[in-house]
Regions:
Chain B
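Transmembrane alpha-helix boundary and packing residues in multipass membrane permease domains
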Residues: 31, 110, 139-144, 153, ...
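Generic hydrophobic transmembrane alpha-helix motif, especially the helices
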Residues: 69, 73, 100-105, 110-175, ...
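Short hydrophobic alpha-helical segments within the ABC transporter permease transmembrane module
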Residues: 82-84, 126, 169, 173, ...
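Glycine-rich helix-loop "coupling/hinge" segments at transmembrane-helix boundaries
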Residues: 143-145, 157, 173, 222-266
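Transmembrane helix boundary and interhelical loop/hinge segments in multi-pass membrane proteins
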Residues: 172-181, 280-288
């Protein structure tokens, strides 16, 4: 873990150390007894450098969205710390978080649930500005028009309601809202997963353009490696609340080390029929174990074809295997 | 009437397409106008006693005539005038009682649903307690202890009928508060109060409005039954409920239908009309259509 910290520490914008988010499971009518813990996020370490896009990949239920929300303190973390610049977010009260909320924003997956259906667009986009009393009523219209232009929407439509827009347009509204406070760090929680394929590329390009223009840093959460490959600089692969591998995008695709990463990569279709026919998929056996009853040792050991005795007994730590490459696997270490 | 293409604009269009709802609304409006302009419509004062001509006896139980459109009641008062003025009292009681129950129910439902945990537990147990109150018994005891007044009826109905609103609002809040736009508002640092008022309340207003109409109909029925039993609106103030009191006498019930049929019918009509409006609203607000 110490190794992760020392890499270009000066350039780090946000770092997560030993982050755990556990949800107690209770049962009973009168006296609610705790019968177990869902370890949604179970000890994460990573750092995100200024101006980069950090991809976080994993299948559904592995805790990627929980991680994103815990960083913004929308979900309280159980353990660990989150440093933004030099401030520990987990130790702050919601009141102390207020000024930092300008810097840290979020884009949501479902563009139908992330916009208040009773508010016209002008109110949706200006809401954060009003919450931070950053604009007066007279400036509102100009500022919203400016933001709408930035994300490629026609400001003429600012008095319309969300249901009058398409999915892609709604996602643009969500992006405009997250940019309203001049955010520096944006958690993109599967921002294109709910969109049509034809629209996905547009939104991805928009996100990249804005990043270049405004110097943003993204935590890009996705379950689709091909999307992450396009947008990310570095990628972390998550499995059952833990990171199993972190490395640069190129390295990950050329030299995946963790068996789980290899499995994920083999599932990515290739846009060339000749090569696609030759693609061999690694099929893992069984299902993802329930986060209520995680296997002992390495979380992937129950499905890994190369699992040895040690894998089932001891949990591998995230270790540096080469420059800029960390893997949590006994096989590699 | 509403901002173009807003949720309420669509709902309005759907509502006006529903014939039954529009008829219900028209009937309700008719009674509201009747209540508002009671002094202009009623030929007599509601509590004016009439005497048999040339004699010093009340002209009671007089059959309908051109002088008394719906005859007179057991004290020689004009039934039609009492019916018109009764609309005022009945509607005032119902609307004020519903206002009380809606405010209490909405506030408690919002707090309960939004904050959850111990607050939710306390409020929901309170709801259980209030639901198990024997309303009639409670009112009879209150009216024997205190001087009966119309305000006691209003507050009594209001304080026992907020529970369904509270449960409804709580359930709606639980649904809405997990949506992403609430998370987005929290990520911007919006205060709890603002989230509740600006993001949650506007999105649960539709079911509350349906609940208000249905609650009004139920309050009218409640007032009628309380007044019929003599613990509601007291004489000489006319209400549709206490006008039915005369029907407790077998003689009236059997031989003088003009005394009890009109208040009974208007009561039925108004309640039915309001229910139709409520149904229409519910369909209009259902955006799945």
């Amino acid at each position: 873990m110490a190794e992760i910290k020392d890499v270009k520490r000066d350039n780090t914008l946000l770092s997560v150390e030993g982050l755990k988010v556990h949800f107690p499971v209770r049962e009973g009518i009168l006296r609610k007894k705790q019968i177990g813990v869902v370890k949604a996020v179970d000890g994460l370490d990573f750092s995100i450098r200024s101006n980069e896009t950090f991809g976080l990949v994993g299948e559904s239920g592995c805790g990627k969205s929980t991680t994103g929300r815990a960083i913004l303190r929308l979900i309280e973390s159980t353990e660990g710390s989150i440093y933004y610049k030099d401030k520990n977010l987990t130790k702050m009260t919601q009141k102390e978080m207020m000024p930092l909320r300008r810097d840290l924003q979020m884009i949501f997956q479902d563009p139908y649930a992330s916009l208040n259906p009773r508010q016209p667009v002008i109110d949706i986009i200006s809401d954060p500005l009003i919450a931070h009393s950053m604009i007066s009523k007279s400036e509102k219209q100009d500022k919203v028009a400016q933001l709408m232009e930035l994300v490629g929407l026609n400001p003429r439509f600012m008095n319309r309601f969300p249901h009058e827009f398409s999915g892609g347009q709604r996602q643009r509204i969500g992006i405009a809202r997250s940019l309203a406070l001049n955010a520096k760090f944006i958690v993109c929680d599967e921002p294109i997963a709910a969109l049509d394929v034809s629209i996905q590329a547009q939104v991805i390009n928009l996100l990249q353009d804005i990043q270049d223009k405004l110097g943003l840093t993204y935590l890009f959460i996705a379950h689709d490696l091909s999307v992450v490959r396009h947008i990310s600089d570095r990628i972390a692969v998550m499995y059952l609340g833990k990171i199993v591998e972190i490395t640069g995008k190129k390295e990950l695709f050329q030299n995946p080390q963790h068996m789980y990463t290899k499995t994920l990569l083999s599932a990515v279709p290739i846009a060339d029929p000749a090569k696609e026919r030759k693609r061999t998929r690694i099929i893992t056996e069984g299902e993802v174990p329930s986060p209520l009853h995680k296997p002992q040792g390495c979380a992937f050991s129950s499905r890994c074809p190369y699992a040895k005795k040690i894998c089932r007994e001891q949990e591998p730590e995230l270790k540096k295997t080469s420059e800029e490459h960390w893997t949590a696997c006994w096989e590699v270490q | 009437m509403f901002k173009k293409n807003s949720f309420y604009d669509f709902a309005y269009r759907r509502f006006t397409r529903n014939r039954l709802a529009v008829i219900g609304f028209a009937v309700t409006l008719f009674f509201v106008i009747m209540a508002l302009f009671a002094p202009l419509i009623a030929p007599h004062e509601p509590s004016e006693f009439f005497f048999v001509e040339g004699q010093n006896v009340y002209d009671k139980y007089a059959a309908p005539s051109s002088e008394h459109l719906l005859g007179t009641d057991s004290l020689g008062r004009d039934v039609f005038s009492r019916l018109v003025y009764g609309a005022r009292v009945t509607m005032m009681v119902a609307l004020l009682a519903v206002s009380i129950s809606t405010v209490i129910g909405t506030v408690i439902g919002l707090l309960s649903g939004y904050f959850g945990k111990i607050i939710d537990n306390i409020f929901m147990r309170l709801v259980d307690i209030v639901i198990s109150f024997p309303v009639l018994f409670l009112l009879i005891s209150i009216s024997t202890i205190m001087d009966p007044s119309i305000w006691i009826v209003i507050f009594a109905i209001g304080f026992v009928s907020w529970t369904s609103t509270a449960r409804l609002v709580r359930a709606e809040v639980l649904r809405v508060k997990e949506l992403d736009y609430i998370a987005a508002a929290r990520a911007c640092g919006t205060s709890n109060l603002k989230i509740i008022v600006k993001h949650i309340l506007p999105n649960i207003l539709a079911p509350i409005m349906v609940q208000v109409t249905i609650g009004t109909a139920q309050a009218i029925l409640m007032e009628a039954s309380l007044s019929f039993l003599g613990v509601g609106v007291q004489q000489p103030t006319p209400s549709w409920g206490n006008m039915l009191m005369d029907a407790q006498k077998l003689l009236v019930l059997r031989d003088m239908p003009w005394i009890w049929i009109p208040p009974g019918v208007v009561n039925l009509l108004l309640v039915l009309a309001i229910y139709f409006v409520g149904d229409g609203l519910r369909d209009a607000f259902d955006s799945r259509q």
